[in-house]
Amino acid sequence: MKEVKSIIAGVVATGKVGDYILYQRLGVPCIRRASTKKRSADSYTETQRIGQSRLRYLVSLYQALQPTVVKRAWQRARKRPGQTGFNAFVSQNYAAFGKDEVIADYSRIKMSEGDLRLPLGIAVAVTGPRELMLSWDIRKDKLLGEATDCLYVLLMDGDGSFRTVVKEETGVCRGDGRAIVALAPGEGLPEHLYCFWASANGCRFTPSWYARIAWQ
């Protein structure tokens, strides 16, 4: 049994999704492996059905991101005793999904969590037909971290498919102050950008930062 810290005020999300069951124990949301017993779909409440749908799509999103640095970020995130990176990802991203089984608010998706701080003044601008520039303040009192912290950028489509391009080898550090993000030939124009920084040894992370891209 794994505990999941809920961030949904007034919503009790329970039900079976794939190999997992989301349930409440002493008021604490938990996840455990599902048993082989069958349960009639008619026996679920509407709240449980919504919880099932959200968890199903959260699992799909996590699986899509597993091959990337996002998995390591959540493994390193501060968690409750016994909580896995997957549990932490679910609890922090549950509220981003709506009743219609899609991401309702992309700004509430968290691609990383950690104890490092984001630099101040982060901004994104469209600088070409297929190019973005990400910038941030590098003055000493604004940098809020080591100049050697590595930048990671994620670009996500807005069609609910979870198609995400992860720029893991940006070669850009916190001390550089800006990064040019060029789309590869054949890549569609993403609607959503997430970025975060990791320490040079890859053991500590910042929370992720989000922006919607306004292509011209």
Residue ranges of model-derived segments:
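Long, polar/Ser/Thr-enriched low-complexity segments
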Residues: 1-120
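Charged linear interaction tracts used for macromolecular binding and regulation
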Residues: 77-216
